[in-house]
């Protein structure tokens, strides 16, 4: 096991031992899925959109997850308030710019949150990351039309410009701080046909941010997803059985197997 892999191993182990409270402002489609995933890996999720609660909640939460999947004017206001409060309290947050590039509102919302509040990690698919880096690319709703390798330079640019870590999901996941690049292999072809897999990656990134620096947190989350996804696919006949097996595999996670999936 390399030094990097040992760091991933220890970070996941620490997250499980600390069971951090993760405040999620996520989308309505995946809320139950991501809450169950966080519980399965050992974290403690809370889902609240109410601005009046943020001061109290972010005083006890270890990290914040902001996911723009189901945007409304009310949710946009809540996201800005949550990020502002998190910054004030030094609570790290991860942003998932779901569907950036699909509509002007989504793109603007994501860019505003990045520029104004400096997320520790931006986690998205290749198309979303390329759009946020200023590249012109057609998107297909919330799904990517680009492969992860196409987005590497965009990810580096975005990371350097905003002093953040960019995590790009694909057949091989790429994580970069603008200089260092990490690769995570594994997962399953059944993951893209299950709603919420990217959002789950972001939620687990939030859990890992509670105990790790942003680069290790982002890589650890993708290692967890890759390991659980690959193992679940071997026990599944299709998307429905995979969804159940995936949560089970998160719960039974082989930390050693997960950590060994990362390389530089």
Swiss-Prot record:
CDD domains assigned: THZ_kinase
Pathway membership, UniProt: Cofactor biosynthesis; thiamine diphosphate biosynthesis; 4-methyl-5-(2-phosphoethyl)-thiazole from 5-(2-hydroxyethyl)-4-methylthiazole: step 1/1
Enzyme Commission identifier(s): 2.7.1.50
Residues the record lists as binding ATP: 123, 169
Q: Which InterPro entries match?
A: Hyethyz_kinase (IPR000417), Ribokinase-like (IPR029056)
- One GO biological process from the UniProt record? thiamine diphosphate biosynthetic process
Q: Which reaction does it catalyse?
A: 5-(2-hydroxyethyl)-4-methylthiazole + ATP = 4-methyl-5-(2-phosphooxyethyl)-thiazole + ADP + H(+)
Q: Sorted alphabetically, which keywords does the UniProt record give?
A: ATP-binding, Kinase, Magnesium, Metal-binding, Nucleotide-binding, Thiamine biosynthesis, Transferase
Q: Which Gene3D superfamilies match?
A: 3.40.1190.20
Give the enzyme's main class according to its UniProt record, as a single word. Answer: transferase
Cofactors required: Mg(2+)
Coiled-coil positions are: none
Q: Care to name a GO molecular-function term for this sequence?
A: ATP binding
Q: At which positions is substrate bound?
A: 47, 196
**Task performed by this protein:** Catalyzes the phosphorylation of the hydroxyl group of 4-methyl-5-beta-hydroxyethylthiazole (THZ).
Family affiliation? Belongs to the Thz kinase family.
What is the protein name given in its UniProt record? Answer: Hydroxyethylthiazole kinase
Q: Which organism is it from?
A: Brachyspira hyodysenteriae (strain ATCC 49526 / WA1)
